[in-house]
Regions:
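A glycine- and small-aliphatic-rich helix-loop capping segment at beta-alpha/alpha-beta transitions
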Residues: 104-110, 285-290
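Glycine-rich loop(s) and the adjacent beta-strand/alpha-helix scaffold that form part
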Residues: 5-6, 10-36, 215, 231, ...
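Conserved redox-cofactor binding core of oxidoreductases
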Residues: 37, 41-48, 54-66, 80-82, ...
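Conserved N-terminal glycine-rich FAD pyrophosphate-binding loop of Rossmann-like flavoproteins
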Residues: 18-48, 90-103
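Short, polar/flexible loop-turn hinges at active-site or ligand-entry regions and domain interfaces
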Residues: 110-118
Length: 359
């Protein structure tokens, strides 16, 4: 949307657009929140303490209850077939990116297998995006630099907790003595975190990443939405639940919402998330008599299994527990793929769950 606005086009966003919980003040840290027993109980577990894990709870990781933007309940009343997996939804302004990550990894040419364009064709767009997102990473090349974000040189880095440093040092020690055994490469993650020295949004290691960054250091689409709202040729309409498109001779002329209202359009970009975009598209096909099937099932990314491997850092067992980087991924890894039908390397997320555990 911002790129179109900068080129002089008129842009209107139709969004459901609820607002997520407001982050705490910039002066707050994990330790300061925890020091107030009554406030911290409400903050971490909810007013009714519904966020406390049950004895038989087998989930390794949960998003906090104070982030309603992350939910397993879809506003489309489960019209989609999700029997093979449990999807995560966001019905909030900014979408899943409000609490989903900040990982910023570009495709390399090896990833472009099967595409009709090359890495070079999209490299300029990557550079513009990284500048806009203030992506931070290793200022000096690491073991991943030839595989990840090869075209981008980082001007700022993000801090890593002591557990991250210990994990990375162990990997480097292993490579030093076993140089031929480099099937798993570990390095600093590439994150959309504004960590520039002169930035007033610089990360201060408060430890509240997953509960909402008080410094607004972590990029979210809300940042770009604010930039869009500076243009006179931009309109944002929320409280809209899009139902389907109405076409004439294969050309989309209207967007219809669930209340029956129609919105005249010239061009449409569908960006309602992987599942809800599919719901809107499939309903559009049926409403416009392009298909009469009630269910179209394809195999896709969300049908694949996720492999979770817990890792215990024994060297940290007798060290003080740190709260500067709780539940955030300061490291990433690339694993060599032996299947010739896939790219040579597969990305692995190393999720820090405190000082002792990685997932």
């Amino acid at each position: 949307a911002l790129t179109l606005l900068q080129k002089g086009h008129k842009v209107e966003i139709l969004d459901f657009g609820k607002s997520d919980s407001i982050p705490l003040k910039k002066s707050k840290t994990f330790k300061s929140v925890k020091s107030d027993a009554q406030f911290s109980a409400n903050f971490f577990y909810g007013a009714d303490l519904e966020g406390i894990n049950e004895p038989n709870d087998n989930e390794v990781f949960k998003y906090p209850v104070r982030r309603p933007s992350i939910s397993t309940v879809n506003m489309y009343d489960n019209e989609e077939d999700t029997r093979q997996f449990q999807p995560i939804f966001s019905n909030y302004k900014g979408g899943l990116a409000l609490a989903w990550g900040a990982n910023s990894i570009e495709f390399n040419q090896d990833d472009m297998i099967g595409f009709e364009y090359t890495k070079q064709d999209i490299e300029a767009a990557y550079k513009k995006a990284y500048k806009r997102f203030h992506v931070s990473g290793p200022v000096k090349d690491d073991d991943l630099s030839s595989l990840v974000n090869e075209s981008h040189k980082f001007n700022s880095s993000h801090d890593m907790c002591s557990a991250d440093d210990a994990f990375k040092r162990y990997a480097m020690f292993k490579y030093k003595f076993f140089p031929k055994n480099k099937n798993v490469l570990i390095g600093q993650s590439r994150l959309a975190i504004d960590n520039r020295l002169n930035s007033n949004q610089k990360c201060n290691s408060c430890g509240l990443c997953i509960w909402g960054c008080p410094s607004n250091s972590i990029y979210t689409p809300l940042n770009t939405l604010k930039d869009c709202q500076k243009f006179n040729n931009f309109k944002y309409t929320n409280n809209i639940k899009v139902s389907h498109f109405i076409s004439n001779n294969g050309i989309i002329e209207y967007v219809a919402d669930t209340s029956g209202a129609r919105y005249k359009v010239d061009n449409v970009i569908l960006a309602a998330g992987a599942i809800n975009s599919a719901i809107i598209l499939l309903k559009s096909l049926k409403e416009n008599k392009i298909t009469d099937k009630n269910l179209i099932r394809t195999a896709g990314l969300l049908d694949t299994e996720v492999i979770k491997i817990p890792y215990l850092s024994l060297s940290k067992m007798f060290k003080p527990f740190t709260t500067d980087k709780i539940q955030f991924n300061g490291l990433m890894a690339m694993v060599k793929n032996r299947n010739k039908d896939f790219p040579s390397w597969t990305q692995v997320e190393l999720l820090s769950l405190g000082s002792l555990i990685y997932q």
